[in-house]
């Protein structure tokens, strides 16, 4: 019967590790949204265009 308390200690320890690892830091840099042509700018067609006019 010594196995059950040891199991509960391990289970609570594993759940606390999962809970701590899921939290993100406050100053975590968010991924910027990519628009067309994998560009960060919303209207980037003139930048990637092969013609001299937009």
From Swiss-Prot:
Q: Name one GO cellular component term.
A: extracellular region
Record-linked CDD domains: Toddler (cd20244)
* Classification via Pfam families: Toddler
The superkingdom of the source organism is Eukaryota
Which GO annotations describe the biological process of this protein?
angiogenesis; apelin receptor signaling pathway; cell migration involved in mesendoderm migration; coronary vasculature development; embryonic heart tube development; endoderm development; G protein-coupled receptor signaling pathway; heart development
Cleaved signal peptide residues: 1-23
Molecular-function annotations in GO = apelin receptor binding; hormone activity
| Stated induction or repression of this protein's expression | Up-regulated following myocardial infarction (MI) (at protein level).
- Knockout consequences: Mice lacking APELA are not represented at the expected Mendelian ratios. Mutant embryos exhibit around 10% to 50% incidence of incomplete penetrance of embryonic lethality. Fetal death is increased especially in mothers devoid of all Apela expression. Mutant embryos show extraembryonic tissues anomalies, such as ectopic anterior chorion, mesoderm yolk sac and blood island protrusions and reduced allantois thickness at 8.25 dpc.
Purpose:
Peptide hormone that functions as endogenous ligand for the G-protein-coupled apelin receptor (APLNR/APJ), that plays a role in the regulation of normal cardiovascular function and fluid homeostasis. Functions as a balanced agonist activating both G(i) protein pathway and beta-arrestin pathway of APLNR. Downstream G proteins activation, apelin can inhibit cAMP production and activate key intracellular effectors such as ERKs. On the other hand, APLNR activation induces beta-arrestin recruitment to the membrane leading to desensitization and internalization of the receptor.
Family, similarity comment = Belongs to the Elabela/Toddler family.
Which named protein is this?
A: Apelin receptor early endogenous ligand
């Amino acid at each position: 019967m010594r196995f059950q308390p040891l199991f509960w200690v391990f289970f609570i320890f594993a759940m606390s590790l999962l809970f701590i690892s899921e939290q993100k830091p406050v100053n975590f840099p968010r991924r910027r949204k990519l628009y067309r042509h994998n560009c960060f700018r919303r209207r980037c067609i003139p930048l990637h265009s092969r013609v001299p006019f937009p």
